[in-house]
Amino acid sequence: MPILFGCMSNHNELPHERAQFTSFQESTQEDWSLIMRQIGNTQDMVADNALHLLRQLGNDHGGFPVSRLEHSLQTATRAEQDGRDAQYVVCALIHDIGDTLAPFNHPYIASTMLKPVVSEANHFMVAQHGIFQGYYFWHHIGMDRNARDAFRDSPYFDYTEEFCVKYDS
């Protein structure tokens, strides 16, 4: 599976050089040149940071029958076994990565991470899967199970619905 987050480096050796301003208004072109040179180090850590967040899901089940990590692995495995491409499988793997950080808006954490490197369809699917999934249980908790209908005109409605039915249930 290709790494979608850039190449990984030894980020244990971060450069010590730092900009000198105390507010953006005081910053200089030299400060920003330094920051832009070093931003690659931060970008190189994205994959490791995502894997760390994914591993943390193993510590929480939230009352569900399996841990959030097991669920993520099951979702990705189902998608892979169904012949989905690598990008889709990665989306399936990390779609709930924000669950322990922001349970009620977790889809937006994963979709924000993925947006620069995935298709529009996959981004929409990850961003909206929580609302689409609500169709199957929101009526049990006093919410509108048909909230997903607000996206009925989206070209990705069926795509996202299929993700929830086949892989994220």
Where are these regions (language model features)?
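Metal-dependent phosphohydrolase cores
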Residues: P2-L93, I97-S169
